[in-house]
Regions:
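A detector of single, family-specific signature residues
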Residues: 1-192
C-alpha cells in the first residue's frame, strides 16, 4: 500500500500548461542584458537558460579567439577539411564534450517550426543535407551571431522569413541568368 501511493505520487502526470520543471525562478533575461550588454534571447532558438549555459561555458572575454571562425572551431562546429590529391575527403565535425556546443545544437534543433530567417535557413538545409548536418550548420551560424553580438555589442536584428526567402530567390535568379548567359541563352520574365 505504501509502495503504491509512493509510485502514484512519483509518476503522477503534471497538469498541462504547468510549465517546465527546470524553469528559472528569477528573471534571467534582464540579468543577461546587464552581464553581456546585449539581449542574447533575441536570437531565435535561444532562451534565457540556454544563453546562461553558453555564457557560463565560454565567459564574456572573447579575446581568446581572434575571429568568429576560431570560436566556432573551438566549439567543434566547423567541418573537418581532409584533402588528399586535391580531392576533399570527409567533412565531419570533431567530436566534443563542450556543453556550449551541445546547447547551441539544441537551440538550432528547435528552429524547425520557427518563422524567422534562421528557421527558414534551417529548413532549407534540412531538406538538402538532412537533419543532423542542418543542426550543426545552424548551430555554427548561431555561434557566430552570438560571438559578434557579445564582442562588438551589436543587437540582433531579425529580418524575418520573407526577407530570407526573397533574398534566396534573387540569388537563384542571378545564378540562373549567369549560367544562361554562359550557355548563350537569355532569361526573360513572363507575366502569369
Amino acid at each position: 500500500m505504501i509502495l503504491a501511493s509512493y509510485c502514484d505520487r512519483r509518476y503522477k502526470k503534471r497538469k498541462s500548461g504547468s510549465g517546465s520543471k527546470n524553469k528559472l525562478s528569477f528573471d534571467a533575461s534582464s540579468h543577461l542584458i546587464r552581464i553581456a550588454g546585449v539581449d542574447l534571447t533575441a536570437i531565435p532558438g535561444i532562451e534565457a537558460s540556454t544563453a546562461l549555459k553558453i555564457i557560463s561555458e565560454i565567459g564574456l572575454d572573447l579575446n581568446r579567439w581572434n575571429s568568429s571562425k576560431q570560436f566556432a572551431s573551438w566549439l567543434g562546429l566547423c567541418p573537418g577539411n581532409k584533402v588528399s590529391g586535391g580531392k576533399r575527403l570527409g567533412g565531419k565535425s570533431k567530436r566534443t564534450s563542450n556543453n556550449a556546443a551541445s546547447a547551441l545544437k539544441i537551440a538550432a534543433s528547435t528552429l524547425h517550426s520557427n518563422e524567422s530567417a534562421l528557421g527558414a535557413f534551417f529548413r532549407r538545409l534540412k531538406s538538402r543535407l538532412g537533419t543532423p548536418q542542418a543542426i550543426t550548420v545552424t548551430a555554427h551560424k548561431i555561434a557566430i551571431i552570438m560571438f559578434e553580438m557579445i564582442k562588438n555589442h551589436i543587437e540582433y536584428n531579425e529580418v524575418g522569413q520573407d526577407y530570407y526567402e526573397n533574398q534566396y530567390r534573387d540569388r537563384l535568379i542571378k545564378n540562373l541568368s549567369f549560367r544562361a548567359k554562359n550557355l548563350g541563352f537569355e532569361l526573360k520574365k513572363i507575366s502569369c
